[in-house]
């Protein structure tokens, strides 16, 4: 079965994730079928946090690929950027 999930890259304490279509039996960071985008949780300045190729994502889901829970959240955020801004506001209010 094909799964759409995150594959970790980057350096120690500086994570960077690729959104990939891969066989569910493979290890998290092993070879994948296709890279569909990326997610950088630690952005600075003008760096782009999230990129997803929606056409390819739709293609793989039409072929029966299962999407992981975290990637579902990221797709929602990608389609509606206000979700991310709201989450940041809530987290900063809790830290006060």
Curated annotation (Swiss-Prot):
Biological processes per GO annotation: translation
Keywords for the protein's UniProt record, in alphabetical order: Ribonucleoprotein, Ribosomal protein
Keyword Ribosomal protein: yes
Record's keyword annotation contains Ribonucleoprotein: yes
MF term (GO), any: structural constituent of ribosome
Organism superkingdom: Bacteria
Stored InterPro entries: Ribosomal_bS16, Ribosomal_bS16_CS, Ribosomal_bS16_dom_sf
GO cellular component: cytoplasm; small ribosomal subunit
Entry similarity comment: Belongs to the bacterial ribosomal protein bS16 family.
Protein name as it appears in the record: Small ribosomal subunit protein bS16
Organism: Vesicomyosocius okutanii subsp. Calyptogena okutanii (strain HA)
GN (gene name): rpsP
């Amino acid at each position: 079965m094909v799964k759409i999930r995150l594959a970790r890259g980057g350096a120690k304490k500086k994570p960077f994730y690729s959104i990939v279509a891969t066989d569910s039996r493979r290890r998290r960071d092993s070879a994948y079928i296709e890279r569909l985008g990326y997610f950088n949780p630690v952005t600075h300045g003008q760096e782009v946090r999230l990129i997803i190729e929606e056409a390819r994502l739709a293609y793989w889901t039409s072929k029966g690929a299962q999407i992981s829970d975290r990637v579902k959240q990221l797709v929602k955020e990608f389609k509606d950027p206000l979700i991310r801004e709201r989450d940041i506001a809530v987290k900063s209010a809790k830290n006060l």
